[in-house]
Amino acid sequence: MLSLSERAPICSPQSAPSASASDTCKMEENMNQQKTLEADISNTSVNQSPQSKILPESSPDNQDAEHEYRSPPPISESKELSPQSRTTPGSSPDNQDTEREYPSPPPISGSKEISPQSRTILESSPDNQDNGHEYPSPPPIPESIELSPHSKALPESSPDNQDIEPECPSPPQIPESKELSRQSKILPESSPGNQDIEPECPSPPQIPESKELSQQSKILPESSPDNHDIKCEYSSPTPIPESKELSLQSKILPESSSDNQDIKCEDPSPTPISKSKEVSPQSKILSESYLDNQDVERECPSSILITESKELAVDLPGSISLAPEKTASTDVGENSSLAFIFPKSTLAGDDALKSVFDMAKAHLECEDSKVKEELYVESTVVIRDDMVVNPASGVESIDMSENLLESLMEQSCGTFYMDGTTALEGFLSGSTKEEPQCSSPIALSTCSSPIALSPWGEHGYYQGDSVGSSLWGVQDDDPIGNIWPLSSQAPALQYSSGSTAHFIDEATVTHGNNGVVLSSTPGEEVGLPNSGVCTDWGLVEQVNPETNDASVSMIDKNSGLVDSQPSANDGSDVGTARNTNHNTNLSLNHETAVPLSRSSGEASRKHGFITDLNVATSEEALGNTKNWNPYAGNANRGSQRNHHRDRYSQISESWLLSSNYSRSRSDGFGTGGSSRSTPRGQTQRGICKFHENGYCRKGASCNYLHP
């Protein structure tokens, strides 16, 4: 062995004139050593050990003792070259004679992949390079499919402790491992002061048949460089065989302090989780621990053995807890559904339920109120368009508004229905644009309380004011300006089942089961054929007995019977053609319903319900009823009638004649209804709309005029 005193460098500092000359000599020595090594490498085997891929450069001062020991034995039959000696440091020409005195390292045969423990060997200082190769090369690693990545990225070591870095042997063989332990994928950087004993720990043992490895330490916390000397003193985690899903308990590990990192790995690795199909993710997100308490973080085992668990312990992500320190988790049984934890609201549970119940109750009450306001119409609905008024009488039809639509909804013991042929536009008149918020002039009642609706939004309409002719339509002529005022102190409709009440020119047409009731028509007697416990709808009217030419038609509130008292001037009966002051011919075929369509002549023909109201009024009768005002204490109603008189005068008589009810039929009310009458005091038949080209589609049963 050569000593330092026996070295004879070519250019020494004593023989050189200056320091620059000594540096030049050292550079020349390094170049000569590199050239010599290149010639030696060409004679070696094809594959060499990767332990010396990048050897640190050594200074020329310590180069004489660098190769005093055995060189590595030759490596033969290796598929991949050993990168350990690809780039060997240059040696001085003084020590070149003893460079090959020792045999090469033993061959590493049958190795598919070489251990990457020393793929990247950090450069060491030239002062400590003399003891860099005092030990033999690592033993061969045969038939290893994938090597342990425990030392893929080795931390940089200081040049002071590099002399004993390769003392540890290479990791043992890990055969048939599909996926290696990821515990040390990312190794924390260590300080150069404690790097001398870092690789002393053996590599992790074999992990056979593990499909997915423990991810407990995917992200290892950074450790301080002061306590890194004993980090790897303990063994790697035990094998986890046949685990399909790994424990997610510590996916995100809390950051640890640098002061207490020395005992972080003192405890054993997690216990094996075998045959676990679904693993509890209860602690996916672990709370971050403080830096001072990190020394006792891993004193306990990290995971719990879960064997043959099929059900998940579900941590509901949608559950929001007001307390952020608590995690809302629900264990789900095998046959049970997920129990969700709903977020807490500022409103208490009782208040929330109360508000929901209040909303539902209000909705039901609204619907109930609509039910009470709806008039039951079984089969007959009479509209303004289907009314016939004698043009000579000057009486115009009722102008019903949109609000009547809601009042004519059908009610049959809690069941609602509308006729399919109902056309809602029939309730709209030609002068609705001129009227300010007209409502129905009908007083509705559903078995209990009557609802009085004013036609023009007047408050005291049914509280003492006389119901003038403006309610039912008037004409500009003064002699017939106040025609048939409907006098009713408190008009109310009595409830009955299976019937219909309508207003046609001061007349309530009641379509009963066996007959027709016409009430509140002056100068006419109407009888009720059928009366029961719950009878037809009828308008309760109180007529002033001072009238002479008009009959008083009363309906009993209890029985619904019509009490008609003809006047002394009117002695005619129903069923006779009367040539009196008021002649009303009502012909009803009460088997089917009346269509609501304005232009549905076909529907009228199908249903066969025709109501003809031909009124012939003389000046004598008008004179008797002109100043008829049964309401006491109200003398201003006449001016209101005059105000509303012009509003309804715009309806043309030709439009009235073109309606479906311009035809007069006298099926059960006498023979005089079908006779041709004069404009004053006589009846008049309508013109048949079904007569085309000299042929009527109704046949011989048609009683209308065929021009």
From Swiss-Prot:
Keyword Protease: no
Keyword Iron: no
InterPro entries linked: Znf_CCCH, Znf_CCCH_sf
Region of interest (Disordered), residue spans: 1-290, 558-605, 624-647
Pfam families in UniProt: zf-CCCH
Zn finger (C3H1-type) location: 682-707
This protein's UniProt keywords: DNA-binding, Metal-binding, Zinc, Zinc-finger
Compositional bias ranges of the Low complexity kind: 8-22, 579-590
GO terms of molecular function: DNA binding; zinc ion binding
Polar residues: bias regions: 30-52, 81-95, 112-129, 246-260, 279-290, 561-570
Protein name: Zinc finger CCCH domain-containing protein 20
Source organism (scientific name): Oryza sativa subsp. japonica (Rice)
